[in-house]
Regions:
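C-terminal alpha-helical interaction appendages
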Residues: 1-73
């Protein structure tokens, strides 16, 4: 993963954690744990998926689906 890709991924993690805090009433630590321990995170760090280049809203929908159903759609 190059520096630009890492920056985009880190930005997504931050934004998704903030969204999860708001929607699920989580602390920052719990929200980050949710994101970092998700199947979504495995996929976003795989540059071949291109998820790092998608919008935070799109990625958050994937994370919410995983929380609700146990897997990324």
């Amino acid at each position: 993963m190059n520096e630009q890709t890492q920056y985009l991924t880190n930005s997504l993690v931050e934004q998704l954690a903030l969204m999860a805090m708001k929607d699920y009433g989580l602390t920052m630590v719990d929200a980050l744990a949710l994101v970092y321990h998700s199947q979504w995170y495995e996929k976003v760090t795989d540059t071949e998926t291109g998820l790092y280049f998608q919008s935070p809203a799109y990625n958050y929908r994937l994370l919410r689906h995983e929380v609700a159903f146990g897997k990324v759609n």
